[in-house]
Amino acid sequence: MPTLTKLYSMEEAATHNKQDDCWVVIDGKVYDVSSYMDEHPGGDDVLLAVAGKDATDDFEDAGHSKDARELMEKYFIGELDESSLPEIPELKIYKKDQPQDSVQKLFDLTKQYWVVPVSIITISVAVSVLFSRKT
């Protein structure tokens, strides 16, 4: 017969964040590590830092041994109710400008930059032609 697992919300787990009442969430499982605080090899500060939070990344980053993972089962009290997790908004992906658009924009800007030098050269040539005819 399958055993029923109690579900806890993330909000409920978050209220258990003290030295004498410390829960951590790892891989969607909730652990009451209150009685383990003094025994933890990294000290109680490590557990308090992640108390009432999802500590999955911190747990994995620490590189826990197989024995540590087996010891966790002793403190298992239930699972995280995934419906209690806040929804992550969907990311909108915007397409970058196509290379043709970028080239076209550059070409358009180039026209603007050449207007002044070309105008100066044209006026200079016209003035020099006019003065050379008069003399």
Swiss-Prot record:
The chain crosses the membrane at residues 113-132. GO terms for molecular function: heme binding; metal ion binding. InterPro entries: Cyt_B5-like_heme/steroid-bd, Cyt_B5-like_heme/steroid_sf, Cyt_B5_heme-BS, Cytochrome_b5. Heme binds at H40, H64. It is a single-pass membrane protein. It is found in: Plastid, Chloroplast membrane; Mitochondrion membrane. The keyword Heme applies. Gene3D superfamilies: Cytochrome b5-like heme/steroid binding domain. Residues 5-81 form the Cytochrome b5 heme-binding domain. GO terms for cellular component: chloroplast outer membrane; mitochondrial membrane; stromule. Keywords: Chloroplast, Heme, Iron, Membrane, Metal-binding, Mitochondrion, Plastid, Transmembrane, Transmembrane helix. Its main location: plastid. SUPFAM superfamilies: Cytochrome b5-like heme/steroid binding domain. Belongs to the cytochrome b5 family. Interacts with BI-1, FAH1 and FAH2. This is Cytochrome b5 isoform A.
